């Protein structure tokens, strides 16, 4: 798999249609853009145990509201460091790491919700997922700039 992701193996054939690249980039942005829907998660998170009404052990809104800003901070940090790394390893490797972080962050955050461990929600969705978001923003932009230097 490492060979498939290496920078040397991402050269497209001469007859490759470059208009496939924006379609793939939009698909990536649609996936990672779901982070901006965080506000729909907040009310149900305050009723994890109580389901219909808030139970005594449920999280407060003030406890879960900071998950989104944590994700955005780590988005910025990851994007800042990813630019140089992308130049070294190529956009394909960065995209795969993005998918693993974003998907893995969702899974860890989900485990935190099921087990009622707030720190897992922050770690998964906020930190790991946020890093995946940052990587996800850098890779398509870099690829589009290279495929469309005339635009």
Report each predicted region and the residues it spans.
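Paired small-residue
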Residues: 105, 116-127
């Amino acid at each position: 798999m490492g060979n498939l992701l290496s920078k040397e193996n991402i050269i497209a054939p001469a007859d490759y249609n470059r208009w496939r690249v924006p379609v793939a980039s939009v698909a990536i942005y649609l996936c990672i853009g779901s982070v901006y829907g965080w506000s729909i998660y907040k009310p149900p998170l305050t009723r994890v145990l109580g389901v219909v009404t808030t139970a005594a052990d449920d999280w407060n809104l003030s406890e879960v509201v900071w998950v989104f800003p944590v994700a955005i901070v780590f988005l910025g940090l990851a994007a800042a460091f990813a630019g140089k790394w992308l130049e070294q390893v190529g956009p394909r490797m960065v995209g795969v790491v993005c998918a693993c972080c974003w998907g893995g962050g969702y899974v860890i955050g989900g485990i935190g919700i099921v087990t009622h461990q707030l720190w897992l929600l922050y770690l998964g969705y906020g930190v790991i997922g946020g890093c995946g978001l940052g990587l996800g923003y850098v890779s398509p932009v870099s690829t589009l700039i290279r495929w469309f230097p005339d635009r």
